[in-house]
A protein has these predicted regions:
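Active-site environment of divalent metal-dependent phosphoester hydrolases
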Residues: 9, 29-30, 61-65, 89-92, ...
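Catalytic core of the metallo-beta-lactamase
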Residues: 6, 10-17, 114-149
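Pre-active-site segment of Zn-dependent metallo-hydrolases
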Residues: 18-56, 60, 68-72
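Short internal beta-strands
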Residues: 79-89
Length: 149
């Protein structure tokens, strides 16, 4: 497994089977009303992310679910599965749909799914903060991704 740090909470995780998981895409432009900026600016063009297989969104804050970045990505990315915590919060699902995502995989706390041959994802939810963490497991590797919680 290879992990490329893009910026902030955005990682590009590549499995040995070359599946690509993009986390919390904030890739382009400012966030939080121009108060936060990516530094350094991303070295990648939007085409670099054209073959993403999954997107993981940890929570609904703008620096993790960034509309300008989503619009900047190739349009077909909105068809890939979005793995997200199921807080029971309608606003998050409504936001995904408003941003053009239709393939939502909403996981409850401690719920696991297998996304590919021997690639397992387990969701951990912090209900107090409406945030989440993710455990990505393969036969011989575990990666724990935690953001603001």
């Amino acid at each position: 497994m290879k992990i490329e740090y893009i910026n902030h909470a955005c990682l590009l995780i590549k499995t040995k089977d070359n599946k690509k998981i993009l986390t919390d895409p904030w890739l382009h432009g400012p966030s939080w009303g121009n108060n936060l900026w990516i530094f350094p600016k991303s070295k990648h063009t939007s085409d670099y992310f054209s073959d993403i297989d999954y997107i993981y969104m940890s929570h609904g804050h703008e620096d993790h679910l960034h509309k300008k970045s989503i619009d900047w990505l190739p349009e077909h990315i909105k068809e890939v599965p979005v793995i997200s915590p199921d807080f029971g919060a309608k606003y998050l699902i409504d936001t995904y749909k408003k941003y053009g995502f239709s393939n939502l995989v909403m996981l409850k706390d401690n719920e696991s799914i297998e996304i590919d041959n021997n690639i397992r994802i387990t969701m951990f939810i912090n209900h107090d903060d409406h945030d989440s963490s993710l455990l990505l497991s393969t036969d011989n590797t575990n990666v724990f991704f935690q953001t603001d919680n």
